Structures are given as C-alpha cells and as structure tokens.
Amino acid sequence: MTQAAGGTGFPVPGTGRVTVAVPAPGPGQGRWVGAPSAAADPDGGFVVAYRVRITDQRGAATVVARSADGEGLTTVATLDKGRFGAMSMERPAVVRTPEGRWRLYVCCATPESKHWWIDVLEADEPEGLADAEATTVFGGDEHTGVKDPVIRVADGLWRAWICCHPLDEADEEDRMTTAYAISQDGLDWAWQGTSLAGRPGTWDARGARVTAVLPDGRASYDGRATKEENFSERTGLARLAGPDGALVAEGDGPVADVRYLDVVPLPSGGYRLWYEAPLADGSHELRTELID
C-alpha cells in the first residue's frame, strides 16, 4: 500500500507521463535494468547512467547514455564489472563538475564478500568515461560496505549520501542506513555521520537508502521492512533537517512501488524522473517520467 505525497509537492512516480527508457534485459527474476542517476547537459538534454543486471552475472555493467529529451537514450559508454575486478555493480552517480567536466562514481562488489566500494572516473565528455582512469574515493572497510551514492555539488561544496551496509552479522548484510559526507573537490571526503536510518516497527525498519535530494532539501529514499523485501524496496519521502545533511522521513508509508528514483529539476519548473520499476515476471525496467 502506498500513500500520496501529501503537501510536500515532491514529484512522485506515477503522477506524470511515463515512458520505458530501457526495457528489461530479459524476462524473469534477476534480469534488471535501472538504478539510474541523471544530470542535466548544457545542451538542454541529459546524461543518464544506469546498471544492467543479468541473473548469472549479477550487476554486469554500468552504462552511460545521452538523451535529448530524457526518453530516448543513446549509449556512449559501457563499463563492464571486470574492468574493476568487481563481482557486481550497482547504482552509479553521474555529475557535471563546476569546471564543466563529467564524473562517474561507480559502486563495485568485492569478490567472495558482501563488501562494496566506490570508484570515480572523470573525463571532458561522457564518451570519455569509457576509458578514464578509476580512483577509489569511498573504500568502505571490514565493518561496512558502501554503495549507491547520491552526489550533489553547489556553491563550492560537494555533498554525498552513501548507502552503508553493516558487515558484522553473517546473512544480515542487507540492512542499510545512509551516511552523509562532504568535500571541497568531490575526491577527498569527510564523513559527517548517519543521515537517515530505518524506523523500528515501520515499513522502512530494515533500512533506508537515500535516492534523490532536491536543491530545496526535499528528498526521496528506498525503504523496506524485512530481509525478504530485499530488491523490492519502495519509495518514501524525506526532507533535510539541518545543515549537517541529516534527513527526516515524511509520512507514514511509501509513495510508490518503485526503487532508485532520481529527479532532475527542469528550467521550466517541472521535473524529469528516472526509476527502476518491477514487472510481473520478476524483471525490472528503467522508466522515465515528465512532471510539468
């Protein structure tokens, strides 16, 4: 059961014109495309990065695409997990720097482990990310896996919301919270503590993963109540509660049965949304939505 966005005015999936941007890579459980991140391109279009998952390969690759309208995507770079020595890949973050270059933050799974880390690549244009050098910026440690970054830069400050998975209990690594970090350059980061965590006894008790933060502090996150709901998270809303990056959940339940929502505000005042949506056969597709 989902709830309306109430008076927050947050652009909620299912309230605009929906288009399938990238179909599922095949029918059935584990064949997923999604976990998108998007940024506005100076030419009026968008750059979108997303993960492709195939059952026997898990997160097989991160794809970078250009789009003139947000709906039709043209692939300009594909980064295979093998390039990073990763067992899997998950949600990337694509960012245009204040200097006009492009960065791609990719999250990678350590083989034979539940650990994750995050690398960054940089190039003059999105096409150049295919061959750019990778540098680790969030390494995690033996106690924590880090993944699914949400990164924003404004007024000379880089801000990151990072999904953290504790590794202290075997078979319980799906638990998740979101931590907050800041940086002057987007490369050297200082952790600021927990930004958002699940609430005991509620729909997000098992974990809370921030997925989008708007310039005015409105935000969205993925949540779930149980271990069994892993990979079937739903979207909830939150808001910034202060200058330290802390977020407070809004409402008593989810607002959409999708996950990995990203939102780009448009010059016209509307929003372009991208998110990962489940299908009845267990596959997932990447959808986009225009909200005027």
Model-predicted segments: where are they?
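Carbohydrate-active catalytic/glycan-binding domains of CAZyme proteins
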Residues: 1-292
